[in-house]
UniProtKB/Swiss-Prot annotation:
The keyword Ligase applies. GO terms for biological process: glutathione biosynthetic process. The gene is gshA. This is Glutamate--cysteine ligase. The lineage of its organism: Bacteria, Pseudomonadati, Pseudomonadota, Gammaproteobacteria, Pseudomonadales. Keywords: ATP-binding, Glutathione biosynthesis, Ligase, Nucleotide-binding. SUPFAM superfamilies: Glutamine synthetase/guanido kinase. It holds the Pfam family Glu_cys_ligase. It catalyses: L-cysteine + L-glutamate + ATP = gamma-L-glutamyl-L-cysteine + ADP + phosphate + H(+). Its EC number is 6.3.2.2. One of its GO terms (molecular function) is glutamate-cysteine ligase activity. Pathway: Sulfur metabolism; glutathione biosynthesis; glutathione from L-cysteine and L-glutamate: step 1/2. The keyword Protease does not apply.
Length: 535
């Protein structure tokens, strides 16, 4: 390990956290995972059936819910100290869901199955309460603004936090004028800046969507190549078409680049976006000719979560509280990494070995020095990310660093050298060598592109002489067999079923007892709540 490659700033922080009395702080980091996946039929068509009642109420079940569509499930683990327990929890959720799916399957990759016409993709329904209706109308607005097809892309969100005591320890060594809460927020925003600089590396290592079903593009122009079969489009060196400009894109959001200089400027930019009318949306209005709601408002964003980003600063919200209100009131609590593809070779879409590397990577982003992003740096970060998702495995690919081209493999290897001492520290804290082993696995992918998930997807399709849909269905069937032959214990099954039953009762109680406020007034109050916040 070349210690001289580390900045003095990072070395100082690592030495502090590595002291015997402080090492246990790294055992207290929290890890949570959210995994989205489509329900499909045995013939790889979208399952347009309602969300299975046996899974509980999507509005109130904290572990099994829906994302955009009735057909798009979302599994949510609690935030746990041991990532092995987080992955195990995710695995148990899958096993419970499979016990209630009948003949349906969970779609294995991020990019969707062949989709029906947009009008036949069902929007997720959350019942008749005002908050349930608000979630439904918000999704109608997403359909209006971006189309339903884009909303059917699935991913993995990885939530990570350091314990507050770790931030308090680091604050003691720095000249920072604010209080502990401000320092923690300041530090998480600094983490996000570094994540923007280096997240291309995650796309190279874990991108797993180099191909898609041709129908996904709905006839739009593209530069993809046809191969494998008539319905498959791909790019030969792509790592993640999901995260490319083929995926989620928005003209309205094009000028919305929240400043990651500090929490105040970040929340201000989002507040402005949810309060600023956007002409094409104004022309449509909030209601159709029948008086039905079609979007919550005509602003750049209906709500702050509409802003699409690779990573978000987060704070757990109280009941009825909006995300920005929570951030302004109590500061940043954790980050949500949002750019991870689902690995179609893994039953849960993510492995413990991957989780251990992400921990070390995010911790590196947190502990390394993080200057403010200059305008050219923002531009380079975006173009580097786009280059890697579209052609990350291209031999000799160069990225831009400090306004100079640098070979991807050279930069990636240098980053690995800097992340290694953090992996070593995590191993010392946990009495293991698993983080260093994960570093070695990732370095092997840098040395040999054939080991990356994106290359393995294309190699498997080639070996089996199949297109995207046939490959994805085969993987989905393999995982279904795994989960169905590994059922939960009777007690675990009963616990999940009780949670599902309770969630249905909670939704019914909410609908029966909520204060009678007409929906228009409710939406108006919801909109006003964000305008009244003061930093």
């Amino acid at each position: 390990m070349k210690d001289y490659t580390l900045s003095e700033f990072l070395n100082r922080r690592l030495a502090l956290l590595g002291e015997r009395n402080n090492l246990s702080l790294l055992e207290q980091c929290l890890h949570g995972i959210e995994r989205e996946c489509l329900r499909v039929t045995a013939t790889a068509e979208l399952a347009c059936t309602p969300h299975p009642q046996a899974l509980g109420a999507a509005l109130t079940n904290g572990q099994v819910t829906t994302d955009y569509s009735e057909s798009l499930l979302e599994f949510i683990t609690p935030a746990l100290k041991n990532p092995a327990e987080t992955i195990d929890n995710l695995d148990r959720i899958h096993r419970f869901v499979y016990s209630k799916l009948g003949d349906e399957l969970l779609w294995s990759p991020s990019m969707p199955c062949p989709l029906p016409d947009e009008e036949h993709i069902p929007i997720a329904y959350y019942g008749t309460s005002n908050i349930g209706k608000l979630k439904y109308v918000y999704r109608k607005g997403l359909a209006l603004r971006y189309g339903k097809t884009m909303q059917c892309i699935a991913g993995i969100h990885y939530n990570f936090s350091l314990p507050e005591d770790a931030w308090a320890l680091l604050k003691q060594t720095e000249d920072f004028a604010g209080d502990a809460r401000d320092y923690q927020s300041h530090s998480y925003i600094a983490l996000i800046r570094n994540f923007r600089r280096y997240s291309w590396l995650l796309m190279y290592l874990f991108g797993a969507s180099p191909a898609l079903d041709a129908g996904f593009l709905r006839g739009r122009k593209h530069q993809l190549e046809q191969h494998f079969d008539a319905d498959t489009l791909y790019l030969p060196y792509a790592t993640s078409l999901r995260m490319s400009d083929l995926g989620y894109q928005s003209d309205a959001q094009a000028d919305l680049t929240p400043c990651y200089n500090d929490l105040v400027s970040y929340t201000d930019s989002l507040r402005k976006a949810v309060a600023t009318p956007y002409k094409p949306y104004v022309e449509v209005g909030t209601h159709d000719q029948n008086g039905e709601w079609v979007q919550l408002n005509t602003n750049v964003l209906q709500i702050e979560n509409e802003y699409y980003s690779n990573i978000r600063p987060k704070r757990v919200t109280y009941s009825g509280e909006r995300p920005i209100q929570a951030l302004v009131a109590r500061g940043v609590q954790y980050v949500e990494v949002r750019c991870l593809d689902i690995n179609p070779f893994l039953p849960t879409g993510i492995s413990l070995e991957q989780s251990r590397f992400i921990d070390a990577f995010v911790l590196y982003c947190a502990l390394e020095e993080s200057q403010q992003l200059a305008r050219h740096e923002c531009s380079n970060a975006s173009s580097n990310f786009l280059s890697v998702v579209k052609e990350g495995r291209r031999p000799g690919l160069s990225l831009m660093r400090d306004n100079r081209p640098v070979d991807l493999k050279i930069w990636a290897t240098e980053l690995m050298e800097k992340i290694t001492p953090i992996a070593r520290l995590l191993d010392q804290a946990q009495g293991t060598d698993e983080h260093l082993k994960s570093i070695a696995v990732q370095q092997a992918k840098i040395d040999d592109t054939a080991l990356t998930p994106s290359a393995q997807v294309l190699a498997s399709m080639e070996a089996h002489n199949e297109g995207f849909t046939a490959f994805s269905l085969r993987q989905s069937q393999v995982h279904a067999e795994y989960f169905r032959t590994h059922p939960l214990s009777a007690q675990e099954q009963a616990d999940f079923e009780a949670q599902a039953k309770t969630s249905i009762e909670e939704q019914a109680e909410l609908e029966a007892t909520e204060e009678v406020v007409d929906f228009d007034t409710f939406v108006g109050s919801y909109q006003a709540s964000i305008l009244s916040i003061s930093n």
